[in-house]
């Protein structure tokens, strides 16, 4: 009689659950995921005029960054461009939790925020300068730009520094192909340039995250 497979199945399910955020193991990723779920559901089912006003107010365009930079930076990271079904949302859940397990919640939040801020400023400051120089119209100061993708790319970059070499370089190769494809298409120029900048921010965090390393105390 063949041996029962239930224990193996249970072990597989347990391993799968460990990759997801949880309030005990990864409180930052878990709480942030719930927050993004709430804002995504509201974006889908809330009053359209109110949703539009909130998204406009959360946009990290030059107009908002020049008048209220800090609130705008944080507000823009409360929404997922494309909603909860976006590929960014799916990858976000696993990547953020994986990094938090290795370096703790506060450090993970710092990596995410650093990538979000640096890539945003690196793409918006040239827009402002181009408008001042007369190379772009003033309408370029007002755009709808929000989401978690810059922070996510920085998190991916930092996480790869803690992976085994095979997984590290395979992941970076796949991400590089996707980023080059975006640069060639140039559907969203600022996002296309911002994503590799954010990834480089994450790669620059390798020395810091490696000093902490897997198994470090949370915080």
Q: What annotation goes with each model-predicted range?
A:
Residues 11-56:
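N-terminal signal-anchor transmembrane alpha helix
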Residues 100-108, 158-171:
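Membrane-helix interface "capping/anchor" motifs
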Residues 44-98, 105:
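N-terminal TM1-TM2 helical hairpin plus the immediately adjacent luminal interfacial "cap"
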Residues 36-41, 116-125, 174-187:
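Aromatic-anchored segments of alpha-helical transmembrane domains
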Residues 139-159, 194:
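Membrane-interface micro-motifs in multi-pass membrane enzymes
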Residues 105-135, 199, 203:
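Hydrophobic alpha-helical transmembrane segments of integral membrane proteins
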Residues 72, 90-97, 152-158, 174-184:
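Hydrophobic, membrane-inserted alpha-helices
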Residues 187-202:
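Loop-to-transmembrane alpha-helix initiation sites
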């Amino acid at each position: 009689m063949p041996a029962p497979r239930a224990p193996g199945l249970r072990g597989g399910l347990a391993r799968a659950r460990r990759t997801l955020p949880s309030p005990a193991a990864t409180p930052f990723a878990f709480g942030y995921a719930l927050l993004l779920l709430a804002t995504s559901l509201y974006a889908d089912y809330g009053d359209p005029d109110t949703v539009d006003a909130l998204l406009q107010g959360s946009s990290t365009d030059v107009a908002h960054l020049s008048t209220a930079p800090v609130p705008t930076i944080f507000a823009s990271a409360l929404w997922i461009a494309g909603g909860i079904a976006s590929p960014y949302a799916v990858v976000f859940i696993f990547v953020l939790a994986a990094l938090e397990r290795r370096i703790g919640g506060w450090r993970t939040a710092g990596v995410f925020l650093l990538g979000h801020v640096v890539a945003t400023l690196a793409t918006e400051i040239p827009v402002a300068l181009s408008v001042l120089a007369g190379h772009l119209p003033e309408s370029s100061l007002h755009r709808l730009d929000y989401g978690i993708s810059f922070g996510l790319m920085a998190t991916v970059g930092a996480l790869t520094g803690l992976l085994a070499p095979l997984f590290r370089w395979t992941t970076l190769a796949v991400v590089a192909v996707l980023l080059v494809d975006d640069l060639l298409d140039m559907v969203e120029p600022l996002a296309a340039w911002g994503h590799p900048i954010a990834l480089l921010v994450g790669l620059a965090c390798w020395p810091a995250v490696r000093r902490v390393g897997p198994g470090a105390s949370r915080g």
